[in-house]
Amino acid sequence: MMRQSILIILIFISGCAVSIPSNQDDICKILDENPRWRSMLYNSSEKWGSEPSTLMAIIRQESSFDPNAAPDREKILGIIPWKRPSSARGYSQAVDATWDQYKKETGNYRASRSSFESSVDFVGWYLSKAPRSGIRLNEVDKLYVAYHEGYGGFQRGSYKDKDWLLEVAKKVKFDSIRYKRQLNNCPIEKPKKWWNIFD
């Protein structure tokens, strides 16, 4: 009985573990590897108005779905690790100030940047402000530029001399289109109840 209880606990813990997707070109496989993400993704989409494919494309670009992603540390003399150039962290790569604003506006004070649920909600929240800057929620390339530069930077045109950023924005748009097409054909499996794991 004890061994069976331990086995159930271990399976439960492993079921809660996060897997960095091995094939990030296929959203169906991403959600298969992390089935709990599906409801979190669609909850954010319904709450804030952005397509699930857009949310996932931005998170992919920002962190490659790594909950511990952070900018590389600067180096002194090219050798000694120093501070990071930005406070960006987690799936969404949100910086401290914007993350604090999100928590204050939503009341989600327990949010964590290493949590997919918190992060996908953050991205949806941030993109929901885009129409105020004249960006439609289906203009994925513009959404990404504004996400990267901030809405103030977008309105000032800070991106206009950043050809590399415009190329990245095109890639995000392409990923979003591909994810949307794939989502229409994803087989949806209901998660197994923990008490049926031995069936």
Model-identified regions with their sequence ranges:
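Residue-level signal for mature regions of secreted extracellular proteins and peptides
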Residues: 9-10, 21
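Catalytic glycan-binding domains that act on GlcNAc-containing polysaccharides
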Residues: 18-194, 198
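C-terminal motif of bacterial Sec signal peptides marking the signal peptidase cleavage site
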Residues: 12-15
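Sec-dependent signal peptide recognition
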Residues: 2-9
